[in-house]
Amino acid sequence: MSLIHPTAIVDPKAQLDSSVEVGPYTVIGPDVVIGAGSKIGPHVVVEGHTTIGADNKIFQFASIGAAPQDKKYAGEPTLLTIGDRNTIREFVTINLGTSQDVGITRLGNDNWIMAYVHIAHDCQLGSNIILANNATLAGHVHLEDWVFLGGFTSVHQFCRIGAHAMTAFTAAVSQDIPPFVTAAGNRAVPAGINSEGLKRRGFSSEQIMAIKRGYKTIYRSGLPLEEAKLALQAEEEKSPDAAQYLRQLREFIEASPRGIIR
């Protein structure tokens, strides 16, 4: 029995694994590749040069691989790549990349993308990310693994959000959020570390306390940022069990192109 509903329109050039399910009235374009076990719900549009991995679930009315919402885009053959085991809920929009950046929008594996989320051109998302309803990523945003964005969070173009960071409902992010940090407000400001998330992911109490000390060094010590980075480096030597996480925090800050939230 065919797993493609008879009302679906699948271009003959599209490459779908034989186990892919396609729901009623879904449209799939000629340059689309979809891996084994993926389920595409009803009324979904998948277009552009889009590659979707295995065991993804895409719900009704999602728009995947449409042209970037960028006036400079002139039809270049840019890409969208989605990994494995992602859940993409109703009315999500994910756009292709642009030639002004690397030309590709990427999602990793095991991400949970809730309804009405927008992921703009050239965004780079890692794995195990949760984007709550109506979260909006402008172009060129980078999210590292295990990021959680609260509902209606908006992220300015080119911002980067570090691993295990979290935002509160309606946060408006205009600068980079370091790893492990919780941000809240419009505009978003630091509001502690994501302690509960770290506990759930197996961080020890000693590691969490060391990360908290690192947070206080950056945000509560009163040190200028350059001096705070040196203090973080010294803290790495005092906390061998958490040194890799403190180093991750420091290196993120050093590499931040927009500067971190303050």
UniProtKB/Swiss-Prot annotation:
EC number(s) reported in the record: 2.3.1.129
Gene Ontology cellular-component annotations: cytoplasm; membrane
Keywords recorded for this protein, A-Z: Acyltransferase, Cytoplasm, Lipid A biosynthesis, Lipid biosynthesis, Lipid metabolism, Repeat, Transferase
GO function terms (MF aspect): acyl-[acyl-carrier-protein]-UDP-N-acetylglucosamine O-acyltransferase activity
Known pathway: Glycolipid biosynthesis; lipid IV(A) biosynthesis; lipid IV(A) from (3R)-3-hydroxytetradecanoyl-[acyl-carrier-protein] and UDP-N-acetyl-alpha-D-glucosamine: step 1/6
GO biological process entries: lipid A biosynthetic process
NCBIfam families per UniProt: lipid_A_lpxA, PRK05289.1
Function: Involved in the biosynthesis of lipid A, a phosphorylated glycolipid that anchors the lipopolysaccharide to the outer membrane of the cell.
PANTHER family referenced in this protein's UniProt entry, alphabetically: ACYL-[ACYL-CARRIER-PROTEIN]--UDP-N-ACETYLGLUCOSAMINE O-ACYLTRANSFERASE (PTHR43480), ACYL-[ACYL-CARRIER-PROTEIN]--UDP-N-ACETYLGLUCOSAMINE O-ACYLTRANSFERASE, MITOCHONDRIAL-RELATED (PTHR43480:SF1)
Quaternary structure, from the entry: Homotrimer.
Protein's name in the database: Acyl-[acyl-carrier-protein]--UDP-N-acetylglucosamine O-acyltransferase
Species of provenance: Janthinobacterium sp. (strain Marseille) (Minibacterium massiliensis)
